[in-house]
Amino acid sequence: MSKTHLTEQKFSDFALHPKVVEALEKKGFHNCTPIQALALPLTLAGRDVAGQAQTGTGKTMAFLTSTFHYLLSHPAIADRKVNQPRALIMAPTRELAVQIHADAEPLAQATGLKLGLAYGGDGYDKQLKVLESGVDILIGTTGRLIDYAKQNHINLGAIQVVVLDEADRMYDLGFIKDIRWLFRRMPPANQRLNMLFSATLSYRVRELAFEQMNNAEYIEVEPEQKTGHRIKEELFYPSNEEKMRLLQTLIEEEWPDRAIIFANTKHRCEEIWGHLAADGHRVGLLTGDVAQKKRLRILDEFTRGDLDILVATDVAARGLHIPAVTHVFNYDLPDDCEDYVHRIGRTGRAGASGHSISLACEEYALNLPAIETYIGHSIPVSKYNPDALMTDLPKPLRLTRPRTGNGPRRTGTPRNRRRSG
């Protein structure tokens, strides 16, 4: 994999706690990404940071490194109780909270700091058992955090570090009141280290930073470039009748190693899953209706390569670290132009190249002008031959069938149907 996304700045160049540096290097992290190189000098000096960087540029490791260093370098608040964590990391989704926790585990093992995880959906008693033994760093979603706080299972009066990840998504999902509720139960902003990281820093996010942080420094990486230069973008104009057949034909032509297909509704995602599973693809479905344990299992299978294709709503578009995604298909153009950037940001990460293919159908083509205005360029248009689209397609599976979330392993080679233009 290309290392061109890294800077010459090494973690060992900073005055980081030796245990943190050792843990990073053990995991193969030696050089900083641009956002890490900008953030660490500030957080090591005790400055608050509001950071913007494109997805996949290392935001998570930037705030984890800062958090572990700060806790190791500063004593806990006097008379701290067992139910009082020292650091709180808030994430908008369960999947992102789980991912952050997984990324933090090597640092926790190396430093002896204890991690806790709190998210809704399931695992209430299991999560609570960990919290009752005492944790240093608590990672979670706002709803479950508030639930535990109201029952006094956790107390935020000894918080020394706060991280808000994907703050713009917090607004999108309506969590801003929850965030403010949690902040009101912490020590004042000038008595803690505050970090906010997001792929976009809108006016409302900056307002939140002004309100809840202590004179935060704003840092940005590639702020003018909305879409990664390593991502090849492509646009088709199918009719509604030809849209599904075009998608399946493109998949057969591209034969992606690992692809994510985004649609705007759970019903549309289920429909796409049914067609692809029936056609023999190893495909998983990720929507809000999928049970939490199954969602985590599907993400794990996709990451391991047991699934080739993931069909998802935008719940999977923000913050998740899924390596080596080669293709992103926008089956529906998103209603929010920022979601276009976050979707295609699933590919072309960490120095790799990627391919984004969007279908501007009759229903969602009206979203295209706003998207192109936002990203600052027109998406190159490709044509296709309607007569060359796949026709010998099996009847789609229904979601209630036992093979939900997984199809048989693909065999053979792609069918020889080439597009025109």
From Swiss-Prot:
Compositional bias (Low complexity): 402-414
Primary location recorded for the protein, binned into one broad class: cytoplasm
Cellular localization per UniProt: Cytoplasm
One GO BP: RNA catabolic process
Keyword vocabulary terms for this entry: ATP-binding, Cytoplasm, Helicase, Hydrolase, Nucleotide-binding, RNA-binding
Class of this enzyme: hydrolase
Signal sequence bounds: none
Transmembrane segments: none
Methyltransferase in keyword set: no
InterPro entries attached to this UniProt entry: DEAD/DEAH_box_helicase_dom (IPR011545), DEAD_box_RNA_helicase (IPR050079), Helicase_ATP-bd (IPR014001), Helicase_C-like (IPR001650), P-loop_NTPase (IPR027417), RNA-helicase_DEAD-box_CS (IPR000629), RNA_helicase_ATP-dep_RhlB (IPR023554), RNA_helicase_DEAD_Q_motif (IPR014014)
Molecular functions per Gene Ontology: ATP binding; ATP hydrolysis activity; RNA binding; RNA helicase activity
GO cellular component: cytosol
EC numbers: 3.6.4.13
Region entry Disordered, spans: 392-421
Chain positions recorded as ATP binding sites: 53-60
Catalytic activity: ATP + H2O = ADP + phosphate + H(+)
Residue ranges of domain Helicase ATP-binding in the record: 40-219
Motif DEAD box, residue range(s) on this chain: 165-168
UniProt keyword annotation of Hydrolase present: yes
A Pfam family matched in the record: DEAD
Function: DEAD-box RNA helicase involved in RNA degradation. Has RNA-dependent ATPase activity and unwinds double-stranded RNA.
PANTHER family attached to this UniProt entry: ATP-DEPENDENT RNA HELICASE RHLB, ATP-DEPENDENT RNA HELICASE RHLE-RELATED
Subunit structure and binding partners: Component of the RNA degradosome, which is a multiprotein complex involved in RNA processing and mRNA degradation.
Family stated for the protein in its record: Belongs to the DEAD box helicase family. RhlB subfamily.
Name the record gives this protein: ATP-dependent RNA helicase RhlB
Gene (UniProt): rhlB
